[in-house]
Amino acid sequence: MVNPTVFFDIAVDGEPLGRVSFELFADKVPKTAENFRALSTGEKGFGYKGSCFHRIIPGFMCQGGDFTRHNGTGGKSIYGEKFEDENFILKHTGPGILSMANAGPNTNGSQFFICTAKTEWLDGKHVVFGKVKEGMNIVEAMERFGSRNGKTSKKITIADCGQLE
């Protein structure tokens, strides 16, 4: 089985910035990968398209995926509101790692973050389920609109998204 690849077309205040593609590690965390894949395609009738990156901290991460409240308090999974931490096999080894944001153990919904540095203190707390395949330069460009408290200076949105393979 080949791991799925999904893409985000990123916009800044409505202007296209570029495409980021992700490999999803369905071989290691099938349930978590499937949630992100289906939210990227929108095939369940809801998902990431049109949502924003509400929290960007340069040198740390870019967080998004709250398509219900758009501020970090919402979002939902394809399995219902929240689902369990599948496993912690994969680690936060460096830039480009894709991991689930949460509010404590077993509270995965739709929020995720893209690491822009090694974040080993998150190992065992957040489920890593993918990595940037192409477009890390776009993630680095997104970082420039972040701040130390995470507030973004411009609206960073997922203008389009879907599955490539």
Swiss-Prot record:
<comment type="subunit">
    <text>Interacts with protein phosphatase PPP3CA/calcineurin A. Interacts with PRPF19 isoform 2 (via N-terminus). Interacts with isoform 2 of BSG/CD147. Interacts with FOXO1; the interaction promotes FOXO1 dephosphorylation, nuclear accumulation and transcriptional activity. Interacts with integrin ITGA2B:ITGB3; the interaction is ROS and peptidyl-prolyl cis-trans isomerase (PPIase) activity-dependent and is increased in the presence of thrombin. Interacts with MAP3K5.</text>
</comment>
<dbReference type="GO" id="GO:0005634">
    <property type="term" value="C:nucleus"/>
</dbReference>
<dbReference type="GO" id="GO:0001934">
    <property type="term" value="P:positive regulation of protein phosphorylation"/>
</dbReference>
<feature type="modified residue" description="N6-acetyllysine">
    <location>
        <position position="44"/>
    </location>
</feature>
<dbReference type="GO" id="GO:0051082">
    <property type="term" value="F:unfolded protein binding"/>
</dbReference>
<dbReference type="GO" id="GO:1904399">
    <property type="term" value="F:heparan sulfate binding"/>
</dbReference>
<dbReference type="GO" id="GO:0016020">
    <property type="term" value="C:membrane"/>
</dbReference>
<feature type="modified residue" description="Phosphoserine">
    <location>
        <position position="77"/>
    </location>
</feature>
<dbReference type="GO" id="GO:0005178">
    <property type="term" value="F:integrin binding"/>
</dbReference>
<dbReference type="GO" id="GO:0060352">
    <property type="term" value="P:cell adhesion molecule production"/>
</dbReference>
<dbReference type="InterPro" id="IPR020892">
    <property type="entry name" value="Cyclophilin-type_PPIase_CS"/>
</dbReference>
<feature type="modified residue" description="N6-acetyllysine; alternate">
    <location>
        <position position="28"/>
    </location>
</feature>
<dbReference type="GO" id="GO:0006457">
    <property type="term" value="P:protein folding"/>
</dbReference>
<dbReference type="InterPro" id="IPR029000">
    <property type="entry name" value="Cyclophilin-like_dom_sf"/>
</dbReference>
<feature type="modified residue" description="N-acetylmethionine">
    <location>
        <position position="1"/>
    </location>
</feature>
<comment type="subunit">
    <text>(Microbial infection) Interacts with HIV-1 capsid protein.</text>
</comment>
<keyword id="KW-0697">Rotamase</keyword>
<dbReference type="GO" id="GO:0051092">
    <property type="term" value="P:positive regulation of NF-kappaB transcription factor activity"/>
</dbReference>
<dbReference type="GO" id="GO:0003755">
    <property type="term" value="F:peptidyl-prolyl cis-trans isomerase activity"/>
</dbReference>
<dbReference type="GO" id="GO:0005576">
    <property type="term" value="C:extracellular region"/>
</dbReference>
<dbReference type="GO" id="GO:0070527">
    <property type="term" value="P:platelet aggregation"/>
</dbReference>
<feature type="cross-link" description="Glycyl lysine isopeptide (Lys-Gly) (interchain with G-Cter in SUMO2); alternate">
    <location>
        <position position="28"/>
    </location>
</feature>
<feature type="domain" description="PPIase cyclophilin-type">
    <location>
        <begin position="7"/>
        <end position="163"/>
    </location>
</feature>
<dbReference type="GO" id="GO:0043410">
    <property type="term" value="P:positive regulation of MAPK cascade"/>
</dbReference>
<dbReference type="InterPro" id="IPR002130">
    <property type="entry name" value="Cyclophilin-type_PPIase_dom"/>
</dbReference>
<feature type="modified residue" description="N6-acetyllysine">
    <location>
        <position position="76"/>
    </location>
</feature>
<dbReference type="GO" id="GO:0061944">
    <property type="term" value="P:negative regulation of protein K48-linked ubiquitination"/>
</dbReference>
<comment type="function">
    <text>Catalyzes the cis-trans isomerization of proline imidic peptide bonds in oligopeptides. Exerts a strong chemotactic effect on leukocytes partly through activation of one of its membrane receptors BSG/CD147, initiating a signaling cascade that culminates in MAPK/ERK activation. Activates endothelial cells (ECs) in a pro-inflammatory manner by stimulating activation of NF-kappa-B and ERK, JNK and p38 MAP-kinases and by inducing expression of adhesion molecules including SELE and VCAM1.</text>
</comment>
<keyword id="KW-0964">Secreted</keyword>
<keyword id="KW-0413">Isomerase</keyword>
<dbReference type="GO" id="GO:0000413">
    <property type="term" value="P:protein peptidyl-prolyl isomerization"/>
</dbReference>
<dbReference type="GO" id="GO:2001233">
    <property type="term" value="P:regulation of apoptotic signaling pathway"/>
</dbReference>
<dbReference type="GO" id="GO:0005925">
    <property type="term" value="C:focal adhesion"/>
</dbReference>
<comment type="similarity">
    <text>Belongs to the cyclophilin-type PPIase family. PPIase A subfamily.</text>
</comment>
<dbReference type="GO" id="GO:0032873">
    <property type="term" value="P:negative regulation of stress-activated MAPK cascade"/>
</dbReference>
<keyword id="KW-0832">Ubl conjugation</keyword>
<keyword id="KW-0325">Glycoprotein</keyword>
<keyword id="KW-0597">Phosphoprotein</keyword>
<dbReference type="GO" id="GO:0046790">
    <property type="term" value="F:virion binding"/>
</dbReference>
<dbReference type="GO" id="GO:0005829">
    <property type="term" value="C:cytosol"/>
</dbReference>
<keyword id="KW-0053">Apoptosis</keyword>
<dbReference type="GO" id="GO:0006469">
    <property type="term" value="P:negative regulation of protein kinase activity"/>
</dbReference>
